[in-house]
A protein has these predicted regions:
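C-terminal core of ALDH-fold dehydrogenases
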Residues: 318-428
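Conserved NAD(P)+-binding/catalytic subdomain of aldehyde/semialdehyde dehydrogenases
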Residues: 176-254, 258-263
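Alpha-helix C-terminal capping segments
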Residues: 139-150, 173-175, 193-199, 217-219, ...
């Protein structure tokens, strides 16, 4: 049963406790990465047979496989994927940053600018395992495409027949992914980071995964850019006494069913609501297909915190910095400016977090484990880099060269100082 805690009556360590990983996978992942670097495709084939029970003849998904998979998917689901993709594009197109140039009368003879350039190739990791996530395909690929990435590559584990889940491939076609490979786990991350005979090396790796995938991303960071190292799913709901307990419980369970390590937290100013939500959770869990997972998540990591008022509840939310934050209150926009740390915010009583997972438009790849204090959701920005340029005429250089020389000497860098003025000496 979910714990009910009164704010001010328990230690902060209990209020703000987070799940810590108990499995140490660094050495195993390091060995996998080394093997893929040294043996390339051969290692990927072996890992597919070992971990996925799949004996593959090819790592790449062919167009024929794509056509067959898409044809097998319910047309209604294809239509829903296309609607969701439209919403995701609409939101992310607003994130596009433009290059700029500064060339004005204040600094005649000087041109400065910034170029926004997409990475050449992005790699998307899409999990397999206990659930298929076509939503991840859309959320990760569409921003990359909007950014202008030349080639978007997807990796995902096959089933034991050597096939990729058809709904994953359908989403890949809707999103416009260029190439798909049947490989998962740490070995897939290694292949994207270093390249193999089949899998091309990428510049950016994005997408969620298990502890092995997260550790692999951590280890290859620096060789390649990554989006984030994601932890277990989280939801925090701030709800007042007027909230519907059945709705709040359903929203908490929507995250609890993800993973036994997932965290579902309610912060409310109403003990009556706290007790009603606790009862609703107990009533709803047996109705879930993933009841065992949700039960473990709620019992081990779930909590209800009863605060003195909603402003204190907001303070608690900021301290926890959750991945998903729901504001189930009257006039939610009155509280929006007070929210400083959250991956994504869902406003009002009619905005369940599931809208954001699938359909609304904002990205669902979000910072977890409190990293919303300094990190952001996946966006178009993740797939671009910025470079800058400077141009000076001779006349413009003459105006500043001796200031630059003096500055450089203060740092003891005499070659810098000399470089600033040597051109002016040519005419002397």
């Amino acid at each position: 049963m979910i714990k009910i805690l009164k704010y001010g009556e328990v230690k902060n360590a209990e209020l703000f406790a987070r799940v810590e990983p108990t499995v140490r996978v660094e050495d195993v992942v390091s060995d996998i990465i080394r093997n893929v670097r040294e043996r390339g495709d051969a290692a990927l084939y072996e890992y597919a047979e070992r971990f996925d029970r799949a004996k593959l003849s090819s790592l790449a998904v062919t167009e024929e496989e794509m056509d067959e998979a898409v044809a097998s998917v319910d047309p209604k689901f294809i239509e829903i994927l296309e609607k969701a993709a439209k919403n995701i594009r609409k939101f992310h197109e607003k994130q596009v940053r433009n290059s700029f140039i500064i060339n004005d009368d204040e600094t005649p003879g000087v041109v400065m600018g910034q170029k926004v350039i997409p990475v050449d190739r992005a790699g998307l990791y899409v999990p397999g395992g206990t659930a298929a996530y076509p939503s991840t395909v859309l959320m990760d690929a569409i921003p990359a495409k909007i950014a202008g990435v030349r080639e978007v590559v997807m990796v995902t584990p096959p089933n034991k027949e050597g096939k990729v889940n058809p709904v994953i491939l359908a989403a890949a076609r809707v999103a416009g992914i260029d190439r798909i490979f049947k490989t998962g786990g740490a070995q897939a991350v290694a292949a994207l980071a270093y390249g193999t005979e089949s899998v091309p090396r990428v510049d950016k790796i994005v997408g969620p995964g298990n502890a092995y995938v997260a550790e692999a991303k951590r280890q290859v960071y620096g060789v390649v850019s990554i989006d984030m190292i994601a932890g277990p799913s989280e939801i925090l709901i701030v709800a007042d006494g007027g909230s519907n307990a059945r709705h709040v419980a359903a929203d908490l369970l929507s995250q609890a069913e993800h993973d036994k390590l997932a965290s579902a937290v309610l912060v409310t100013d109403s003990m009556a609501l706290a007790e009603a939500v606790s009862e609703e959770i107990e009533r709803q869990i047996p109705l879930l297909e993933r009841a065992e997972i949700a039960r473990a998540s709620i019992d081990d990591n779930g909590k209800i915190i009863v605060a003195t008022d909603l402003r204190v509840a907001i303070d608690i939310a900021n301290e926890i910095a959750p991945e998903h934050l729901e504001l189930c209150v009257d006039a939610p926009f009155d509280y929006l400016d007070s929210i400083r740390h959250a991956g994504s915010i869902f406003m009002g009583r009619n905005c369940p977090e599931a809208l954001g997972d699938y359909f609304a438009g904002p990205n669902h790849t979000l910072p977890t484990s409190g990293t919303a204090r300094f990190s952001s959701p996946l966006s178009v920005d993740d797939f671009v880099k910025k470079t800058q340029y400077t141009y000076f005429t001779r006349e413009a250089l003459e105006k500043v060269a001796y200031d630059v020389e003096y500055f450089a000497k203060q740092e003891g860098l005499t070659a810098h100082a000399r470089s600033a003025v040597v051109r002016l000496e040519d005419d002397q």
